[in-house]
Regions:
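Beta-strand residues that line the small-molecule/cofactor-binding core
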Residues: 19, 115-117
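Conserved long alpha-helical elements within nucleotide-processing catalytic cores of c-di-GMP signaling
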Residues: 4-7, 16-36, 43-70, 79-88, ...
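A structural signal for short, well-ordered beta-strand segments
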Residues: 37, 86, 118-122
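Catalytic-core segments of nucleotide cyclases and related cyclic-nucleotide turnover enzymes
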Residues: 54, 99-110, 119, 125-157
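Short beta-strand-to-loop capping motifs
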Residues: 88-93, 124-126
Length: 157
């Protein structure tokens, strides 16, 4: 039981970064394609922590985790990899299915307390030329681009 706890994020009950690190090697050997990684970065959590307190920030992180649990697809792993960041690893989904799932997540995240939403990036793996690490890095880049777009939209309002 204690061993299992090593892989569980205490706040959200999702799997954690230890779980990711432990599984990356075997995921890289997986020959079922396509695969995808999705990175989700909750917007404004630091701001919530600073203005409303950590309890509210934690509540936001938990609420987002609950959305991910509620909408989880088969053959996927969901991890909280950082304070306000989540990673989803998917096996056997076409890109249009991944995009449609992300759209659903955007919609769900709009209903979180404080309505700050999230920035979501993804990357597809279609053969063994791309590693999980590469895919995660591409997902992070994609997410950062989305985050900049969100910031620009805010500035224009």
């Amino acid at each position: 039981k204690e061993d299992k706890m090593k892989y569980i994020d205490q706040l959200t009950s999702l799997k954690n970064r230890n779980y990711l690190n432990e599984n990356i090697a075997s995921w890289n050997k997986n020959t079922i394609y396509p695969q995808a990684t999705i990175i989700i970065d909750l917007n404004q959590v630091r701001n919530i922590n600073d203005t409303l307190g950590y309890e509210q920030g934690d509540a936001q992180i938990k609420a987002a985790a609950n959305v991910l649990i509620k909408t989880q697809l088969d053959n996927t792993d969901i991890m909280r990899t950082d304070g306000n960041e989540y990673l989803i690893y998917l096996v056997g989904y076409q890109e249009k299915q991944v995009v449609s799932y992300i759209r659903k997540l955007y919609k769900e995240f709009k209903n979180l307390p404080y309505e700050h939403g999230a920035a979501i990036g993804y990357s597809m793996i279609t053969n063994d030329m791309k590693t999980i690490e590469d895919s995660i890095n591409e997902s992070v880049e994609d997410m950062r681009t989305k985050k900049e777009e969100i910031e620009e939209e805010k500035d224009e309002k």
